[in-house]
Design a protein with these regions (language model features):
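ATP-dependent adenylation/nucleotidyltransferase module used to activate substrates
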Residues: 1-158
Length: 159
């Protein structure tokens, strides 16, 4: 990251509570920046027996934001996830396809619903995806990463 390029930008970090997005917050903090952090909630309001609990993820995201002096806001995108990702995935599986729900979640929820609700107020939105960008002819492009094992540009392919 080039500090001169981002120091005056309003930055949002999508903080999942995992290692990768936590490192993003650490990297910004090491540059003296304190982005606003957002935890995207995609689980239902009530605990369901089939639901993956996000409680620990939210606790970790809260701890990371607090450690680096960043604000953390929970953004409820359960409805959007269910109607746009889960339903789409089920329809495609029924039709004999093997969709990738993570790709759809990134496009429709992380960079779709989040952007409509809050992200449009920010100059930059950072995630913990392992990817690179490259400047070509004055435009920034998503490019593959040097480590093919960690490579995650496929998850960002449709944004």
């Amino acid at each position: 990251m080039d500090l001169a390029e981002i120091k005056d930008k309003k930055i949002a970090v999508l903080l999942s509570g995992g290692v990768d997005s936590s490192v993003v917050v650490h990297e910004f903090a090491s540059l003296g920046l304190h982005p606003d952090c957002f935890y995207i909630k995609i689980g239902p309001e009530e605990q369901e027996e089939w639901d993956c609990s996000s409680e620990e993820d939210l606790e970790m995201a809260t701890a990371v934001a607090h450690k680096y002096g960043c604000k953390l806001q929970v953004v409820d995108c359960h409805k959007e996830y269910w109607t746009q990702v889960t339903r789409y995935t089920m329809e495609k599986v029924k039709a004999g396809f093997t969709p990738n729900p993570d790709v759809m979640c990134n496009r429709l929820v992380k960079f779709g619903a989040f952007n409509e609700k809050i992200g449009h107020n920010y100059d930059l939105i950072a995630t913990g995806h392992y990817a690179q960008t490259e400047c070509i002819d004055g435009k920034k492009w998503l490019t593959t990463s040097p480590d093919p094992v960690k490579e995650q540009t496929d998850f960002l392919a449709q944004i």
